[in-house]
């Protein structure tokens, strides 16, 4: 039996819509990374972009487990200005309450993808939006019920 390698003409991309309301961030990001890479398809080829396009709505309503949104001992995000002593620290709770809560999902997914040209191309197929509306209605995205797959995927408490 020969190893299968998909050709560019054989790759078909679908549009998937995920509602992030009350979903656990890490579990959502792990599943989205698998879909973006195309590892959920039988025609997966490691060196080609064969994943689907993913649209995530209601990014501000994603949940964190445990005490990760706490400012004292929670989850921290670091960035550096490039100047000596220029490290900046923010918490996950502050990011979710800011004007751009979709960044927390983008960072989680980006860090689960490979850090090379293909990973950057696959990350460009992710679209995250703050509210219920999105401009991709013409692509007719298929709603993916991520919350119904496992009871651990959803969090009902107001943790943040």
Curated annotation (Swiss-Prot):
| Gene3D superfamilies for this protein | Ribosomal protein L13
In the record, biological process GO terms are: negative regulation of translation; translation
Known InterPro entries for this protein? Ribosomal_uL13, Ribosomal_uL13_bac-type, Ribosomal_uL13_CS, Ribosomal_uL13_sf
Q: Which GO terms describe its molecular function?
A: mRNA binding; structural constituent of ribosome
One GO cellular component term: cytosolic large ribosomal subunit
Record function comment: This protein is one of the early assembly proteins of the 50S ribosomal subunit, although it is not seen to bind rRNA by itself. It is important during the early stages of 50S assembly.
The text of the family note is:
Belongs to the universal ribosomal protein uL13 family.
Tell me, how does this one assemble?
Part of the 50S ribosomal subunit.
**What name appears for this protein in its UniProt entry?**
Large ribosomal subunit protein uL13
Originating species = Orientia tsutsugamushi (strain Ikeda)
Q: What is the lineage of its organism?
A: Bacteria, Pseudomonadati, Pseudomonadota, Alphaproteobacteria, Rickettsiales
